């Protein structure tokens, strides 16, 4: 027979009571926090997995936010190009295309000068549209979103359109003759004699003839800048393509998205073989200048050369307008891809969130049930304690 003593009973009771109290408090904490664990030590395996999921979730959420900003930026860009495209493709009553059709006919008469002014005004309006912003950044400024991309330099008929400080009508410089090493350019003095003395060198030799060294270097610098902005400059964004760097620390281009929009890739830059601008705004501005030279009363051309130039530029304007439409369509495709990528990132976020909640969060119904049972057990322990204390007190009185 096992002898039950008062001290033994109290000791067992205290142990069970403490355990019931701990279980109740733990169940209460779980119900309040709605988490399965609150420290790494409580469940190291689950905590490590939750950390990995949380890191992936934060990265995906960041990619989604960046992509959302890019999507809205492209929406602004698309709407702007839609407006510009309508202006140059005869979709509005004051479109540049309609003006050119009028200008090519011989029925303008005294309205030629007014039409020319409208053409120049339209060119100015296109530039203002292309200087649109999304938030604090200019949409068509490439990687330099803080500074206005397009601006006019000069006044009147001599004004020139510049993109980020570089004239858009800069012509690609011709190749220059090189020395025997195939790298160093040949230089010539004022008499056209080849010289290696830098102090006497004033010209390079090209297929088009002699060119001033300073002028050529300036032209090449400007052309290289335009080429870099149009084809080489990038504004990378992590949109969930697995952004990674190579061994030199450079971002692998295929792992990021280039979200920089260069205005000159849409409007054009440089000059063609005839020396005419490729930029659609410059062409429209030049057409307006030619019309404004016409006689204010009769509308006659200022010269036969002006009429010939106008006809030549009118055809090139139509070609530039067609290229602008193609670029607009291309942007539509890019915008659709970004939207599709956003949908994928949203789906990834939802999946990670579901996995994350499955590891860290408790089922609320189970938590309430566990707490209710723990509370019940604790209350029973208190009642048992009352019985034990009462019996002990009676034993004490009876002794």
Question: Where do the language-model regions lie?
Answer:
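Polar, low-complexity export/assembly segments characteristic of proteins
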Residues: 17, 24, 28-31, 35, ...
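Amphipathic alpha-helical polymerization modules
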Residues: 1-146, 292-399
């Amino acid at each position: 027979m096992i002898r039950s003593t008062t001290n033994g009973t109290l000791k067992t009771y205290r142990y069970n009571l403490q355990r019931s109290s701990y279980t109740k408090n733990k169940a209460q904490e779980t119900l309040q926090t709605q988490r399965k664990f609150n420290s790494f030590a409580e469940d190291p395996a689950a905590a490590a997995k939750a950390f990995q999921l949380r890191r992936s979730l934060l990265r995906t959420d960041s990619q989604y936010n960046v992509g959302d900003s890019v999507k809205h930026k492209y929406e602004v860009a698309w709407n702007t190009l839609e407006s510009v495209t309508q202006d140059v493709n005869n979709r509005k009553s004051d479109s540049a295309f309609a003006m050119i059709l009028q200008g090519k006919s011989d029925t303008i008469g005294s309205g030629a000068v007014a039409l020319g002014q409208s053409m120049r005004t339209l060119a100015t309006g296109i530039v203002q549209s292309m200087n649109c912003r999304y938030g604090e950044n200019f949409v068509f400024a490439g990687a330099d979103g803080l500074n206005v991309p397009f601006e006019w330099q000069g006044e009147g008929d001599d004004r020139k359109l510049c993109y980020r400080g570089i004239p858009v009508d800069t012509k690609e410089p011709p190749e220059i003759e090189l020395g025997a090493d195939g790298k160093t350019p040949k230089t010539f003095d004022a008499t056209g004699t080849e010289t290696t003395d830098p102090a006497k060198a004033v010209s390079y030799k090209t297929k088009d003839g002699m060119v001033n060294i300073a002028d050529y270097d300036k032209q090449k610098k400007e052309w290289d800048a335009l080429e870099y902005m149009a084809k080489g400059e990038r504004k990378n964004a992590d949109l969930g393509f697995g952004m990674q760097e190579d061994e030199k620390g450079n971002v692998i281009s295929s792992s990021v998205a280039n979200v920089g929009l260069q205005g000159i890739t849409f409007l054009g830059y440089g000059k063609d073989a005839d020396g005419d601008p490729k930029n659609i705004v410059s062409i429209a501005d030049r057409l307006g200048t030619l019309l404004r030279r016409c006689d204010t009363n009769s509308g006659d051309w200022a010269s036969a050369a002006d009429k010939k130039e106008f006809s030549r530029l009118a055809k090139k304007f139509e070609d530039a307008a067609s290229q602008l439409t193609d670029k607009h369509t291309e942007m539509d495709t890019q915008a659709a891809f970004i939207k599709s990528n956003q949908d994928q990132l949203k789906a990834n976020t939802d999946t990670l969130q579901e996995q994350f909640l499955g590891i860290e969060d408790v089922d609320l119904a189970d938590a309430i049930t566990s707490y209710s049972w723990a509370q019940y057990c604790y209350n029973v322990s208190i009642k048992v304690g009352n019985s034990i204390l009462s019996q002990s007190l009676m034993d004490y009185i009876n002794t």
